[in-house]
């Protein structure tokens, strides 16, 4: 399985092409639209999300509600493009029109300046448009297809926010996977403690009035993955490494942890390692899950626990100082439309990116020309692991 995305933030549309999806997977536009709508939701989103109503168009690879095994083409129309026809025109236009919405005051924390240097851009909008988080629309669309595969194999997942702009969410003890999932899904903030909703919303409103932004830490949990996915035989086959790369590729993500993560640096080995158990009904298991479901780059059969830290959004309505790329004089950074926080949306993106990596690993590990073939191979492997 592989995919490409294309499109600019204010261009006509966004596109993804996915190759390697088994034939026979039940797939409807509504499956993808559901995830796209989740990405657009959440408290703290800005005006762009009130303009766009993301709906996918499937133009290849699916017939009569089933995948055919051919490449799948997904497209999402940018409604806002109608206001940017001159700025984002494909053909050549008058010089005066080229200066319209030109970006020459790069924003600290964005790809504007370095992208302009690398690709020799006189207008930094050429970097801004593609590096925008709008691109993640299509990664969510791809992830929605991946989640359909995982669901057919009995794999489920959730995400929730652990830290919201410096406010630590108190996680009620002994919540089951399903309870965590339901609480996060029914929260505008993707948190599992409803008692903290108003406190955080008030804080977001305050940050917005200040023209500032906040980040935080997101946790994704995956249930139902059997032991043995990934490999220790080469560095690039380790599944946790693949997940780390994928999570860090999401806009504004600056760190990844598995299990208790960086807290391991403060603990002894006897406190961190997950003791092994065995029962006739369950087979091998672990007493704890400090390592987040990974050992030696492979899944252990425990829930996968992946955490990602998102920096505050770099576009500030009270802009930081920058430099004019023409005169090299100090100047306030360009202001583009932005949100005080996008943590709930980032959680949806992270969840779908993780789903894509896991689906790809499964498709590369098991016979998967068709879904029935994949389901049989996966079921047989689960049975083997249980009796080992």
UniProtKB/Swiss-Prot annotation:
GO molecular function, one term: FMN binding
Xref: InterPro entries: Chorismate_synth, Chorismate_synth_AroC_sf, Chorismate_synthase_CS
Reported cofactor(s): FMNH2
Keywords from the UniProt entry: Amino-acid biosynthesis, Aromatic amino acid biosynthesis, FAD, Flavoprotein, FMN, Lyase, NADP
Signal sequence range: none
Protein's pathway: Metabolic intermediate biosynthesis; chorismate biosynthesis; chorismate from D-erythrose 4-phosphate and phosphoenolpyruvate: step 7/7
PROSITE patterns: CHORISMATE_SYNTHASE_1, CHORISMATE_SYNTHASE_2, CHORISMATE_SYNTHASE_3
Entry EC number(s): 4.2.3.5
Cofactor note: Reduced FMN (FMNH(2)).
Annotated positions binding NADP(+): 39, 45
Residues noted as binding FMN in the record, renumbered to the chain: 130-132, 251-252, 296, 311-315, 337
GO annotation, cellular component aspect: cytosol
Superkingdom in the source lineage: Bacteria
Reaction(s) catalysed (UniProt annotation): 5-O-(1-carboxyvinyl)-3-phosphoshikimate = chorismate + phosphate
An individual GO BP term: aromatic amino acid family biosynthetic process
Reported function: This reaction introduces a second double bond into the aromatic ring system.
Subunit note: Homotetramer.
Family: Belongs to the chorismate synthase family.
Listed name of the protein: Chorismate synthase
Species whose genome carries this gene: Streptococcus pyogenes serotype M4 (strain MGAS10750)
Protein's gene: aroC
């Amino acid at each position: 399985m592989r995919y490409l995305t294309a499109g600019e933030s204010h261009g006509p549309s966004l596109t993804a092409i996915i190759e390697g999806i088994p034939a026979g997977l039940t797939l409807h536009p509504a499956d993808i639209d559901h995830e796209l709508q989740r990405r657009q939701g959440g408290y703290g989103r800005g005006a762009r999300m009130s303009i766009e109503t993301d709906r996918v168009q499937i133009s290849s690879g699916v017939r009569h509600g089933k995948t055919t095994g051919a490449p799948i083409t997904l497209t999402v129309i940018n409604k806002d493009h109608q206001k940017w026809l001159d700025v984002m025109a494909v053909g050549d236009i008058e010089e005066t029109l080229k200066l319209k919405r030109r970006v020459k005051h790069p924003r600290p924390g964005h790809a504007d300046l370095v992208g302009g240097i690398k690709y020799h851009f006189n207008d930094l909008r050429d970097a801004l448009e593609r590096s925008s988080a709008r691109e993640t629309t299509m990664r969510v669309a791809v992830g929605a297809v991946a989640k359909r595969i995982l669901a057919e194999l009995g794999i489920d997942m959730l995400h929730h926010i652990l830290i919201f702009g410096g406010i630590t969410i108190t996680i009620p003890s002994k919540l089951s996977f399903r309870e965590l999932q339901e609480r996060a899904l029914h929260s505008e903030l993707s948190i599992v403690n409803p008692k903290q909703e108003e406190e955080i919303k008030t804080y977001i409103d305050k940050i917005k009035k200040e023209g500032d932004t906040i980040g935080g830490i997101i946790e994704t949990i995956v249930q139902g993955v059997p032991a043995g996915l990934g490999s220790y035989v080469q560095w690039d086959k380790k599944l946790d490494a693949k997940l780390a790369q994928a999570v860090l590729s999401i806009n504004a993500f600056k760190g990844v942890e598995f299990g208790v993560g960086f807290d391991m640096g403060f603990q002894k080995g006897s406190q961190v390692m997950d003791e092994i158990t065995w029962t006739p009904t369950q087979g091998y298991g672990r007493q704890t899950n400090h390592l987040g479901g990974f050992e030696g780059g492979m899944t252990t059969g425990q829930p996968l626990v992946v955490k990602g830290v998102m920096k505050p959004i770099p576009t500030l309505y009270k802009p930081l100082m920058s430099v004019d790329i023409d005169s090299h004089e100090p100047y306030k950074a360009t202001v583009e439309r932005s949100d005080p926080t996008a943590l709930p949306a980032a959680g949806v993106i992270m969840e779908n990116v993780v789903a894509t990596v896991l689906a790809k690993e499964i498709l590369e590990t098991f016979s998967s020309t068709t879904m029935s073939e994949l389901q049989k191979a996966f079921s047989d492997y689960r049975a083997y692991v249980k009796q080992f």
